[in-house]
């Protein structure tokens, strides 16, 4: 007797529902498949290998950090973790190493540039992408556009944010390659 695809799907669904009743689904490990943001991993209670001690050390011992690793090595997740840390999101770090290391949890303005989805064939494409992200950041922080070219706008955004908050500005750049 042969089963067509829909019958196989139904059979698999029935078997899974039987197992789901016997296994506490909530106690199963949730893997963060396709999730690259630290906040989402923590909010969804997904498996997270705690490397926050190194985040703390890099943030407090280095002024500039450049990470160059192969694709799929966790650069975006690490960049997102830095973003949450510098945004003062102590709630996301509950139970992790950094919770014991950090005393102040200062909130800094964070400019997070990501070129992940950008299709750039020309320098003009790159400038357009950066301009779009500058627009988003200016709105996010309630600032008006200050300057015409990318370099001037970026310089003014950093300085205006510093003037507005009195805090150093953190710049994160992801998917630059």
What kind of feature is each model-predicted range?
Residues 2, 8-177:
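Phosphate-binding site recognition
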């Amino acid at each position: 007797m042969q089963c067509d695809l829909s019958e196989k799907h139904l059979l698999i669904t029935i078997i899974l529902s039987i197992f789901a009743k016997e296994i506490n689904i909530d106690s199963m490990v949730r893997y963060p498949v396709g999730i690259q943001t630290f906040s989402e991993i923590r909010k969804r209670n997904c498996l997270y290998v705690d490397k926050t001690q190194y985040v703390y050390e890099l943030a407090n011992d280095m002024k500039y950090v450049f990470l160059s690793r192969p694709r799929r090595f966790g650069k975006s997740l690490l960049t997102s973790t830095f973003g949450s840390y510098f945004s003062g999101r102590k709630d996301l770090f509950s139970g992790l190493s950094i919770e014991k290391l950090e005393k102040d949890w200062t909130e800094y303005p964070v400019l997070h540039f990501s070129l992940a989805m950008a299709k750039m064939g020309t320098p003009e494409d790159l400038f357009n992408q950066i301009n779009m992200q500058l627009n988003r950041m200016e709105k996010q922080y309630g600032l008006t556009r200050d300057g015409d070219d990318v370099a001037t706008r970026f310089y003014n955004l950093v300085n205006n944010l510093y003037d507005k908050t009195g805090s150093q500005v953190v710049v994160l750049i992801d998917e630059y390659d």
